[in-house]
Amino acid sequence: MKWLLLLGLLALSECIIHKVPLVRKKSLRKNLIEKGLLKDYLKTHTPNLATKYLPKAAFDSVPTETLENYLDTEYFGTIGIGTPAQDFTVIFDTGSSNLWVPSVYCSSAACSVHNQFNPEDSSTFQATSESLSITYGTGSMTGFLGYDTVKVGNIEDTNQIFGLSESEPGSFLYYAPFDGILGLAYPSISSSDATPVFDNMWNEGLVSEDLFSVYLSSDDESGSVVMFGGIDSSYYTGSLNWVPVSYEGYWQITLDSITMDGETIACADSCQAIVDTGTSLLAGPTSAISNIQSYIGASENSDGEMIVSCSSMYSLPNIVFTINGVQYPVPASAYILEEDDACISGFEGMNLDTYTGELWILGDVFIRQYFTVFDRANNQLGLAAAA
C-alpha cells in the first residue's frame, strides 16, 4: 500500500503544471490617450508590426528588437530576478525570445518610474561583456547581458541569461504599464543567441513536459494565466486540434483561408500566420485589412484609431480562420474592442511577405477565443475554444 501511495505521489509530481497569473491592465496606448500624448507619440514613433518579424539578418551587427509594437498589449505577469528576488512586471511574449528588464544603471526618465534590477543586491548575479540594443522609433534602448536566477511562478530558473537596460531614450516608455519582456518564441530568433527562459527551464528539468499553454480571459482584470509544463483542460471546451509549426522561429503556422459571410476575403491560396501573445490585435497585409475595415464600417478618428459604430457590433459577421482544415470563427464582439464610449476595430495593417506569401498575426483578439498550447516537443500548436 505504501508503494502504491508513493507511486501515486510520484506520478502527481511529474504532472505538476506551473501557473503564472496574468493581470489585464490599461495598455500603453490608453495611457498615452489619457495624457493627451498619443498624437505626438505617433508622429515620431510610427508603429510597424512588420519589423518585429523581420529575420535577424535584416538588422545590424548589434541585436535589435522593436518596442512600439507593444502599444496595445494589456496582459502582464510578475517574475522575480536575483537572490533575493527583485520583482518585475513583464509581457509574456510568444513573438520574441529574449528576457530584458530595466537596470539601476539606467538614468532615463522611463527607468525612474519602473522597477530596476540592481546586480549588487543579488548574490547570484554574473555579468557578461555582451551588449544588447533594442530599437524603438527614433532611439534605442541599450544595455548588457547577465546571468541570474529567474523565478517564474514557483519555478526557479537558475543561470538564466537576460538583458539589463542602461539607456531608454524617448518619453513613451515612461507611461508603459510593464517593466520588461519575457520572450517565449524559439531560440533561433533570440538576440545574441541568448537561451530563452522556457528553453532553460526544460534543459534544467524544471518542467515535466516540453510545452506551455496560455489562457487569456475576456474579464477586465483577472483570470488569465500562462501555464508551464502542462495543459489544464478546465480552461477549454471540446478537444484540442493540433497544428504543425511551419517555421521554428516564431510560433508560425499555415492558414488555409480567411473568410467573412462565407466569402474568402484574404489568404485565398493559404498563407502564413504567427500566434503572438505580445500583439494585441489581428494583423495582416495592409490592402486586406483596409478592405476589412471598409466592410465593417470602420473610420479613422483624431487619435489615429479605427472606430466602428457600437450599435452595429452585433450585426457584423464573424471572421473565420480555417487552420489545418478546422474553422476558428472570431465574432465581432471579439474583434471590436469597447473602450469607454468608443468601439475600436481590432484589425491592424502591416506588410511583410514570407517566402510562401502574405503573413498574418493572430494576437490577443484571437487567443481570447482559443486556449492555445505551445508544444515545443512536437513543434505544434494546440487550439480549443476557451472556456
From Swiss-Prot:
Q: What class of enzyme is it?
A: hydrolase
Report residue numbers covered by any propeptide: 16-59
In the record, biological process GO terms are: digestion; proteolysis
The UniProt record lists the Peptidase A1 domain at: 75-384
GO MF terms, alphabetically ordered: aspartic-type endopeptidase activity
EC number in record: 3.4.23.1
The protein's annotated catalytic reaction(s) are:
Preferential cleavage: hydrophobic, preferably aromatic, residues in P1 and P1' positions. Cleaves 1-Phe-|-Val-2, 4-Gln-|-His-5, 13-Glu-|-Ala-14, 14-Ala-|-Leu-15, 15-Leu-|-Tyr-16, 16-Tyr-|-Leu-17, 23-Gly-|-Phe-24, 24-Phe-|-Phe-25 and 25-Phe-|-Tyr-26 bonds in the B chain of insulin
Signal sequence extent: 1-15
Q: Which cysteines are joined by disulfide bonds?
A: C106-C111, C267-C271, C310-C343
Which PANTHER family does the record associate with it?
BETA-SITE APP-CLEAVING ENZYME, ISOFORM A-RELATED (PTHR47966), PEPSIN A-3-RELATED (PTHR47966:SF22)
Q: Which family does it belong to?
A: Belongs to the peptidase A1 family.
Please give the function described in this protein's UniProt entry. Shows particularly broad specificity; although bonds involving phenylalanine and leucine are preferred, many others are also cleaved to some extent.
Protein name, as recorded: Pepsin-3
Q: Which organism is it from?
A: Oryctolagus cuniculus (Rabbit)
